């Protein structure tokens, strides 16, 4: 919950910046805002699972729906390291990738600071890659996540006083999967797409 609220708060701060900040900052908002419905669905599914527990098929169904929302918002795997993915295959490949990233981070959440630290490393990697490729919207969309993870890591590091839970770890993995795909769309490199898992 704290991580999700921190990310939303950072997006809100960007919205409230004075006009003197210019269109440079505003350009990054569409990425974060387009992904907000999908991210919120993943978060609330994880939250319900933390509180009440969900059956695996229920979680999978909701995660696939969230991945579909992200695909509709523009997160579409069109190529992998220069290999063009046929249009008819783009949706299932994207769904598989995003659900896989979300659950991969969920699996490593058992050790204090591991998922948060890996998430921060992957976020910074994508941020640097976006800056080097002049992908300003993606760079600005990753900054709120990097800030939220950095602030959370202080309390999640050993000995942890707060934990990500399913709501946090699933959301981090899902967002990083989305950001990796968006990076690869510009650079056509496998590094961008696999950054979340390489962390």
Label each PLM-derived region with a short phrase.
Residues 3-44, 94, 114-199:
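Alpha-helical transmembrane segments
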Residues 60-76:
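Hydrophobic alpha-helical transmembrane segments
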